[in-house]
Amino acid sequence: MAPTSVSNARIEKAVLDAHEKQKNKHGGKNADYIPILAQVPSTLFGVSVATVDGQVFTAGDAGYEFALESISKIFTLALVIEQRGPRELRLKVGADPTGEAFNSVLALELHNDKPMSPLVNAGAISTTSLVDAVGPEDRWRQIVGAQSDFAGRQISISEEINASEQATNFHNRAIAWLLRGSGYIYCDPMEACDIYTRQCSTLVTTADLAVMGATLANGGTNPITGKRVIARKNVPHVLAEMTMEGVYTRSGDWAYTVGLPAKSGVGGGLVAVAPGQLAIAAFSPPLDKVGNSVRAQAAVAQIADTLQLGLFNVPGEEDE
């Protein structure tokens, strides 16, 4: 288990400082195309960091449970890569950024009907269909089981959020049928869409999400439970996808300015991973125009900068 290169005192201070500085940051609005998400208090704001040696630091509303939403994609992706290997995932779904909005179907039309990325909705629905299962309930059991293994505790679904999403997910149903027509879905299309919607409706806290990210940072072993969740060799593939497409159409800018693999969700959550060191998670419902939490982005970026976590940082002194 690799130790962090940053002291616990510095991490704790960075978390508290980021929460204090960003808690009054304005801008953005709750996702309103999923009715129940529009009702979440917009002032909620939590920040957490989990290290690879099992330390967890929190500030603000870090115990509030929110919908995992699109962040769930990385854990289903990890499950499928673990079961089928990175090559099969790449062949059957793709491993490239689309350059389009997360719910766009343009990539399907422009790239021979292939989803391209497992972190946009089309690719995520396709990835869900690749879970090696004997039926829908087995598929669901494995997906929520993977989320629970990453978090180190039993994760559960919000039936209220799921019902709200199932009542409005017409676009995703259409995507599932497009995938069926092109041959890039691997179970019944409506089963895949239903399970995908369910996986987005599970509840986590920022403390949970930080541990989930720290499991990736720790090479696939949960730093709290000690359980190996995915093979170390499969972690880089997940982190690569997070770098390319994790914060929607802002992914390139995020890599340029923050330099950490990350994944956001329209529930207001965001997780970023510093391999071998720690993960940062933040939550606040108001989103920017592309679907990323305004406060969460600011807090994660501040912590990454304070602790000099960016993957592209070059050690050494500045030249005169």
Swiss-Prot record:
Substrate binds at S70, N121, E165, N172, Y196, Y248, V266. It comes from the Bacteria. One of its GO terms (biological process) is glutamate biosynthetic process. Signal peptide: none annotated. InterPro entries: Beta-lactam/transpept-like, Glutaminase. Its EC number is 3.5.1.2. Homotetramer. Belongs to the glutaminase family. This is Glutaminase. It comes from Mycobacterium marinum (strain ATCC BAA-535 / M). The lineage of its organism: Bacteria, Bacillati, Actinomycetota, Actinomycetes, Mycobacteriales.
